[in-house]
């Protein structure tokens, strides 16, 4: 293709994207086809990768194809393993793409499709992809060091020490939440559990095939793995229909929680080429395959976005799906769909230890985040093609809308979104569920959206239930890969912390130390997971409200580290690349964090609904009132009921108090990183650059 034709092609892509984007932004009063959103997103991602990604890669970071990576230099056959770019892309994408891009945009859809679309597309290209890419680059230049260790090396021991503890706490919360989503999806689901279980032997076979049987034959292993995966999905439905096998593969949540912990431990201590990388690569076939099929199906089916462009009545924070104003809570809620601190832990955990060549960081780091942003766009579409009344029936709490279909329809219709009981019951029947009311959390909405689109092309209404349950399975597989990779990254983090106490424990080549660190990691997130599995109001459910804020604080810290390193590298003129998104993310997140620790304010329902401190005050007063009632009644039945209510209120009080304390600690850690970044950039704090020695690819074996 000539230079002129290339320019014409990119001008066409830019013009097409601008037209579709503009049409979505300017349309008023009428429903808009989802095709415009798909086309706008594809065009923006193409332009972002080709031009902005390349600018960051070769102007800002100056990637060097001749520089040896930690995988080549250390190559220990366990954690440091040079990995094919396509396989590593699959591993990295599978590891970072957890619950966030599926759930966040669906919840944020209560504000309308436009605010979420803007942040997912603009934030994904200019913030999230840059964040992942730059952190992967700087970790690769530092022997694959973890985020906390790099903050300690580059920004000072005290700041780094506090940050490491905060990051570890955030990591445990994130992994436990991801694991709980998987447990909820697979509990009582023999089809899902069988299919997920079968990906393990398939992945092991692929790992052995690519390393020993046919080294380097990634294409062959990919075809075999894909065929076996399709067979596993098919026979999962056969297993579910068989009374004997269905019973074997039907596990309750507490049992599944234990299985998850065991799997997380094993996957984290085995050589990365044996299970983790091939399983993540295999999962990526299904992940990207479903997203591509969804995009094509949307173009063919052309469903309308029925959600209004902007539900301005909820911008003040009075929405029924989640509390909090459009700023900052839209950005905090969307989270991983645009930018995620969890990605920094993978970009400084497993992935930098597997890079064959430094130039692969562009495709693996920047490209994977764009793929995740595309997942978020698909999730947003799944929410917005629903009738708004159905969307709010699914995502509003039963305390708000009730449990009777007629009352629910009347309540939601009074909000301005007309819906009939028949519409609710028809959809419920079509997807094979007993109810769709108050199926909060985002996952059921995504599955319903997938079913509504795919049944138009494959099978009609008769197969809508199949596509719904397939989507639930897809979500479980989608999220599980983030759990095993996250646990491995958490192990590196624990070893960094232990290494400050006893140096040999910090050696990641020390296998016994690795086993200890993995056990501590799994025990940490596993405790919260198991408690949540046996008590729907305890364990990780207590910490769930911290996920969004803590995750975004982590992203802000990572971007400030990147800014600091760019200044030390003599690239201060390019610091806007990381500093601008860092400032926006931190302003939004710290503002949200402050709202979460504000005291109770009489009459301010929105602020009180957001604040953990206010919740403590509310629950304390409730406990006092209940104790007064308890002391003034002699009815045994009423006494029993009141005591249960006191127990629940006490649990809520303790949970909110813990959240408030952790929120303050995470903000303190973030402020320390901000202060250190400012001090270093202004030359007030002198800490030398800690980049590892340059080794050429053709020389490293001689050293």
UniProtKB/Swiss-Prot annotation:
Its main location: membrane. Keywords: Cell inner membrane, Cell membrane, Membrane, Peptide transport, Protein transport, Transmembrane, Transmembrane helix, Transport. The keyword Ligase does not apply. The chain crosses the membrane at residues 6-26, 29-49, 87-107, 118-138, 162-182, 190-210, 221-241, 256-276, 282-302, 319-339, 374-394, 463-483, 514-534, 547-567, 574-594, 660-680. It comes from the Bacteria. It is found in: Cell inner membrane. It is a multi-pass membrane protein. Disruption phenotype: Deletion mutant has a reduced ability to utilize a number of di- and tri-peptides as nitrogen sources, displays reduced motility and reduced agglutination compared to wild type. InterPro entries: CstA, CstA_N. Belongs to the peptide transporter carbon starvation (CstA) (TC 2.A.114) family. Involved in the uptake of dipeptides and tripeptides. May influence host-pathogen interactions. Involved in motility and agglutination, and has a role in stimulation of dendritic cells. This is Peptide transporter CstA. It comes from Campylobacter jejuni subsp. jejuni serotype O:2 (strain ATCC 700819 / NCTC 11168). The lineage of its organism: Bacteria, Pseudomonadati, Campylobacterota, Epsilonproteobacteria, Campylobacterales.
